[in-house]
UniProtKB/Swiss-Prot annotation:
Tetramer of two alpha and two beta subunits. This is Phenylalanine--tRNA ligase alpha subunit. It holds the Pfam family Phe_tRNA-synt_N. Belongs to the class-II aminoacyl-tRNA synthetase family. Phe-tRNA synthetase alpha subunit type 1 subfamily.
């Protein structure tokens, strides 16, 4: 073993790394957990007491020589300015392109929905997120004691009890109908707020789509065809739609719209609770009282309206199982949508 130590010491002394990569190779070869010196210490433990006494100091000195050499060259190489050693580098080439971010999935879906409805004549409208009680509740036929008016469901402004954060974009429908004469065909997409616990399935802030059409002789058949056109444009021609009766204060009759589950293709899974269907939006014919509140004669004009949560649509389209991902700004999540932009 003494001869082996002499050979390794000679090899260490002759080693003169010129780059950090060569220095790392030196460390791995001699000082790493599987390096030569570590293996020598393992073999040293199996020697007789007499051999240990003769070789112990020599082995420790060898390790110290290697460590000192590594330390000296590490200091020298790390302080030396990095030089360009690539003689084949072409300085006439353009620089690498900047790494661009991706659009948010909600923005992608919002633009897609607006594009679909613009093709059939819907105008894009907007309204305030801080709303008054009349436009958010009263004009939409909510009774004074309706549960939605409770502080447990709605964010009210403490200094002004009549002012609140809108709970739906239907308030935009009222503002547009007050300021325009029929025929009116409009769609609005924006943030809404509800006093709900933040979880994988609910949030205190989300986006809602609201669209309506008012004209003479508007029928439920038109509503059905518009919704079928929208769902086929968004999800594909193979989409199936189911209409169920429901209740909303601002429409009569009111319906819920279901589509066949995109996860299990209608066969039944945990997402659709093994029914094969997923609720996707609410719709109906505008209640005559709502038209009156907007100074529109319900004996002359009729209309339909429908609304849906944008995040819910996005979760179905992109198979996302946690609503909170939309607001956490996790780059790992967002960069997956470059292909959809």
């Amino acid at each position: 073993m003494l001869q082996q130590l002499d050979l390794i010491q000679h090899e260490i002394e002759q080693y003169h790394p010129t780059t950090l990569q060569e220095l790392e190779e030196f460390r791995i070869k001699f000082l790493s957990k599987k390096g030569t010196i570590t293996q020598l210490f393992t073999e040293f433990g199996q020697l007789s007491p007499a051999d240990k006494q003769a070789l112990g100091s020599k082995l420790n000195a060898l390790k110290q020589i290697a460590q000192e050499k590594y330390k000296i060259y590490a200091s020298q190489l790390q302080s030396t300015p990095k030089q360009n050693t690539d003689v084949n580098e072409d300085y006439t080439l353009p620089p690498p392109a900047d790494k661009l971010g991706s659009r948010h999935p909600i923005s992608i879906l919002k633009d897609r929905i607006l594009e679909i409805f613009e093709k059939i004549g819907f105008s894009i409208v907007e309204g305030p997120e801080i709303e008054d009680d009349w436009h958010n509740f009263g004009a939409l036929n909510f009774s004074p004691n309706h549960p939605a008016r409770d502080m447990l469901d709605t964010f009210f402004i403490s200094q002004c009890p009549d002012i609140l954060l809108r709970t739906h974009t239907s308030s935009v429908q009222i503002r547009v109908a007050e300021s325009q004469a029929p025929p009116i065909r409009a769609i609005s997409i924006g943030r809404v707020y509800r006093n709900e616990t933040i979880s994988a399935r609910s949030h205190c802030m989300f986006h809602q789509v609201d669209a309506f059409y008012v004209n003479k002789n508007v029928s439920f058949v038109e509503l059905k065809q518009v919704l079928l056109y929208f769902l086929r444009s968004l999800f594909g021609e193979d989409i199936k739609m189911r209409i169920r009766p429901s209740y909303f204060p601002f429409t009569e009759p009111s319906v819920e719209i279901d589509i066949n589950c995109r996860i299990c293709n209608g066969n039944g899974c945990n997402i659709c609770k093994h029914s094969g269907w997923l609720e996707i939006m609410g719709a109906g014919m505008i209640d005559p009282n709502v038209l009156k509140n907007c100074h529109i004669d319900p004996t002359t004009y009729t209309g339909y309206a429908f609304g849906m949560g944008l995040e819910r649509i996005a979760m179905l389209m992109y198979q996302i199982n946690d609503l909170r991902l939309f607001t956490e700004n996790d780059v790992r999540f967002l960069k997956q949508f470059k292909a959809y932009a």
